[in-house]
């Protein structure tokens, strides 16, 4: 059994960014762990201004799948890499959200981009975990965004550092808990950070079997009450973990999301607006 499956998920943002490419290469080169790399990405990218109704949605762009795939394979030794057509999410959103007219505050079924940006990362996570389970045996799966920048001073053994507690503590491996960068309260609602997740074997099935539909259920529950969190995805993630009796353990690692025209050498924390 290998130590870690590193699973990239979601939209293929900044795939050709030199800083990010060097970061991931460096992490894999210096780790002492036995790591396989997997990826599940979408055929589109989009950027949004955070808002409760998504009225400020920025246009979606289709990527050159062949070039993106070649670029990724040139950068890292992916054991399996899938870039899937984003339209599959449109079908899932229609199936899971069409009965809930209140969810239009977030997902407008006439604007596919809104559904893809809301539910896409969870379907991508489910598929990525399935890829890892089908092609190897691992103690831990690290689910992570490609465009996540780690503090450059802490590149040394990043993968080792964020997984150590789960690998060294046999009790921890058997416990139902995941590692996350943060759990917090925003506008009175609890959220669990969804940029990076450390998933031990005890929790593999929760992320590989019904994750997309389960998160959809949590999102429908959010829109059944007047109070709504700013971060719908992260509040749905919190509800999903609580419903399945999965605890959280904080991962102590400074990181942030890469943005266009971003200078990664100028450190800012946090870089998101609430």
Map each language-model feature to its residues.
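ER/Golgi luminal nucleotide-sugar-dependent glycosyltransferases, focusing on the catalytic module
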Residues: 1-274
């Amino acid at each position: 059994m290998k130590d870690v499956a590193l699973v990239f998920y979601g939209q293929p943002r900044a795939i050709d960014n030199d800083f990010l490419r060097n970061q991931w290469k460096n992490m894999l080169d210096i780790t002492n762990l036995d790591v396989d790399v997997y990826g599940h990405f979408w055929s589109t990218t989009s950027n949004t201004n955070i808002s409760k109704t998504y009225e400020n949605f920025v246009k979606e762009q289709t990527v050159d799948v062949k070039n993106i795939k070649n670029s990724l394979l040139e950068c890292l030794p992916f054991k399996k890499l899938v870039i899937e057509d984003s339209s599959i999410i449109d079908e899932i959103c229609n199936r899971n959200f069409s009965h809930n007219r209140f969810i239009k505050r977030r997902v407008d079924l006439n604007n596919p981009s809104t559904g893809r940006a809301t539910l896409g990362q969870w379907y991508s996570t489910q598929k990525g975990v399935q890829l890892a389970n089908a092609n190897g045996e691992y103690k831990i799966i690290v689910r992570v965004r490609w465009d996540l920048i780690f503090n450059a001073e802490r590149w040394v053994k990043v993968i080792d550092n964020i997984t150590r507690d789960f690998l060294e503590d046999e009790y921890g491996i058997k416990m139902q808990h995941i590692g996350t960068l943060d759990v917090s309260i925003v506008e009175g609602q609890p959220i669990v950070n969804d940029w990076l997740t450390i998933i031990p074997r005890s929790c593999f099935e929760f992320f590989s079997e019904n994750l997309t539909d389960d998160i959809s259920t949590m999102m429908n529950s959010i829109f059944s009450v007047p109070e709504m969190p700013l971060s719908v995805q992260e509040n749905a993630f919190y509800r999903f973990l609580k419903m399945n009796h999965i605890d959280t353990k904080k991962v102590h690692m400074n990181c942030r999301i890469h943005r266009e025209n971003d200078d990664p050498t100028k450190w800012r924390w946090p870089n998101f607006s609430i």
